[in-house]
């Protein structure tokens, strides 16, 4: 009997697509259909691609478009980080946060909003899930099957220089492309694991707006999340070990962003050292030394 790659998978195995509402159900039907049967390998593949994120999908589609015989292997979600826990959901939140900022700035144009801004965070997140599900068809298993690609769902194991095994099936190939990407790093910060934390893989599953949010790391993703949640109304602390936010960018440009984020209410703690997380009766505290000042927040 052929082994189904997803025979042991359930929605609970994917915390990045919770809650399992109609939109996330539609997403999963596209990027990880639970009823999918892996095809029988046919002959020798010109290219086996391991990982169906942005790089893997482009490689697979490009090779197939040139007439190559392609196998595409993905053990989690087609579309990878960009579709599921990166570019798409973050930009949906950024757009909602920008709308908040526009309403708050409306007075300078003579537009009065007497009742101020009211944030419906569950509706913001539902919109994100709806948009993500709509886009997911472009990265779907069945779309790439329609391109003539053999799509396998499961974990790949290289057993020889020209052989990969997946759920009892043997695939022979001339070339292989490993495009498996990365996972969030669990930082060795005292108290972090005990207190619990979010990553880019789980933050987009929130259904309630956090009253307080600490963001560790002020690169592009950290800044996006910090500013968005601050505009939604969370009390946000952004911690960066380097001398300023966006440490890999031009300092003048980063300084402009820094000023705007402070205007949005983000508390910046740069040159952060001796970071510690403490779970106390009144909630989770972040203790950090920033520019020689000790903060307990």
Task: Please annotate each region the language model reported.
Residues 2-45, 62-68, 73-209, 242-246, ...:
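Glycine-rich flavin
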Residues 121-122, 237-242, 269-271:
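Short beta-strands and strand-loop turn motifs
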Residues 50, 130-131, 216, 248:
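Residue-level marker of alpha-helix boundaries and capping positions
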Residues 44-72, 214, 222-232:
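N-terminal Rossmann-like FAD-binding beta1-loop-alpha1 element of flavoenzymes
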Residues 297:
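Conserved NAD(P)+-binding/catalytic subdomain of aldehyde/semialdehyde dehydrogenases
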Residues 53-58, 81-82, 88, 183, ...:
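Gly/Ser/Thr-rich beta-alpha loop segments that engage phosphate groups in nucleotides
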Residues 207-249:
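Rossmann-like NAD(P)H-binding beta-loop-alpha module
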């Amino acid at each position: 009997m052929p082994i189904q790659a997803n025979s042991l998978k359930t929605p609970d195995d994917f915390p990045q697509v919770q809650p399992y509402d109609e939109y996330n159900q539609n997403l999963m039907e596209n990027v990880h259909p639970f009823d999918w049967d892996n095809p029988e390998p046919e002959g020798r593949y010109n290219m086996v691609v391991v990982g169906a994120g942005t790089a893997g999908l482009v490689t697979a589609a490009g090779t197939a478009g040139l007439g190559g015989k392609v196998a595409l292997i993905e053990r989690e979600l087609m579309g990878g980080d960009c579709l599921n826990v990166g570019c798409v959901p973050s930009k949906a939140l950024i757009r909602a946060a920008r709308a908040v900022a526009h309403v708050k700035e409306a007075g300078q144009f003579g537009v009065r909003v007497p009742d101020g801004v009211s944030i419906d965070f569950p509706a913001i997140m539902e919109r994100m899930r709806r948009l993500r599900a709509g886009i997911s068809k472009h990265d779907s298993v069945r779309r790439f099957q329609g391109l003539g690609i053999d799509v396998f769902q499961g974990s790949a194991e290289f057993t020889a220089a020209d052989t990969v095994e997946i759920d009892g099936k043997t695939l022979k190939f001339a070339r292989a492309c490993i495009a498996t990407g990365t996972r969030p790093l669990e930082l060795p910060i005292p108290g972090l694991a005990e207190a619990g934390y979010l990553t880019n893989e789980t933050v987009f599953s929130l259904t309630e707006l956090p009253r307080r949010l600490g963001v560790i790391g002020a690169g592009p993703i950290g800044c996006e999340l910090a500013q968005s949640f601050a505009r939604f109304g969370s009390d946000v602390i952004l911690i960066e070990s380097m001398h300023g936010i966006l440490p890999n960018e031009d300092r003048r440009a980063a300084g402009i962003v820094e000023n705007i984020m402070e205007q949005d209410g983000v508390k910046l703690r740069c040159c952060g050292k001796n970071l510690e997380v403490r779970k106390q009766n009144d909630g989770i505290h972040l203790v950090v030394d920033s520019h020689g000042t000790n903060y307990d927040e």
